[in-house]
């Protein structure tokens, strides 16, 4: 009886913890676009939304420079506690070098509808829906397409080839993406609870699978193994948010010898690989809970100012190799 009571209490605590994280909207607004156009006034944007399978409006933006020709379309999938503008300094650089960009807010984030963010696995559902909707736009159909994602978005771009996609994908860049929802929950839990985490992950996955039936048992390694796209996987050994070892333990046996997949590893770049992690990380850790406009504006300034231009240039070279 005591054990049964203990298990019920544990299940209740885990349920409350899970819903505390995912039964909410993310209202982050990071005004990166306003920061960028101070230096690049010709960088334009055009709002574009669609209605997803759950009858929620997914709000995105096309970002571009007026050009006679675009090398292709890059679809950006954002990370957790981020929004469609978080990666915009990098996306502007790609746009400046000939690409059309589409970036969107996930369900329950920013300007998109949805009463909550559903669950950790929902980012790949949002990406699949976005790809298949954009595939109906005649002007985009002849273009080559690339996927670009960090963290939650890195998982999405890696995993999405498990689904039926209505347009071919030529290139994928995944930065600090995790292999599966289970692996990510396990890694985050093990940092606090060690091996006891095994007791928690099963019930948490039960709640996750109740909310996202379409994503049950989906892994990035399966999507990457299936895709014909050329893939760049970037990850740092010291990533505190998405475990390097737990991810590569799944990736390497199946992907290391695939000609279309390139790995690029770092020793000390943390979770945000192509950013000056010292200034950005310090500021975010001090002000993560502050949503006032002046804090968000300063964070946006750092996102633009402290971008690692050399690493973003390497990403551009990868895109150009397979998109032009």
Show the residue positions of the predicted features.
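The serine-hydrolase catalytic nucleophile loop
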Residues: 80-93, 106, 245
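Short beta-strand/loop motif that positions the catalytic acidic residue
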Residues: 227, 233-239
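C-terminal catalytic histidine-bearing segment of alpha/beta-hydrolase fold enzymes
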Residues: 258-324
